[in-house]
């Protein structure tokens, strides 16, 4: 039987607390990726210092106006890359895994499908240390659709595919936030 997470109750607007670690961190320990609306991003404050930086960055501006290319939010700890992507079919895409950072993706214009695997990644390419990316194959466990106003947060070590073709959808403009693990999170992934 699949066990679905019970998300924390959203806080009233204006009462977002930085002390939600006790509510949100168990989601990251017991479950896979997070899929939610951008309006709910403040509910995830307190999970990670570097994720907090990205959440505050997103909530403070109209991200649809971000320029194409790479923008540093906090040095190399938090970076956003905005690009236009031509979606591909799932059979043509490899799963990817990042061991030293989490990835938050949102579509600025258009829609795409994504897949996440709860299984181990079988590498088919050597790890690119510069981008912390390992490509390979894995069984699909979760699939969904990403569109404007929604985000997917892929956890470190979690195989996923994104930028997959959704029926009736063409090119899309997306923002990909690469977020380094906090030092205490790195210790947890090494255990």
Q: Which residues does each predicted region cover?
A:
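Conserved metal-binding segment of the jelly-roll/cupin
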Residues: 145-164
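Short, conserved beta-strand element in jelly-roll/cupin
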Residues: 99-112, 118-120, 127-133, 178-179
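A short beta-loop-beta micro-motif enriched in histidine and acidic residues
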Residues: 75, 91-103, 120-125, 139, ...
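A short, N-terminal "cap"/entry segment at the start of jelly-roll beta-barrel domains
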Residues: 2-82, 92-97
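A short hydrophobic beta-strand segment most commonly corresponding to one strand
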Residues: 151-153, 169-186
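Conserved short histidine dyad/triad with adjacent acidic residue
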Residues: 80-98, 108-122
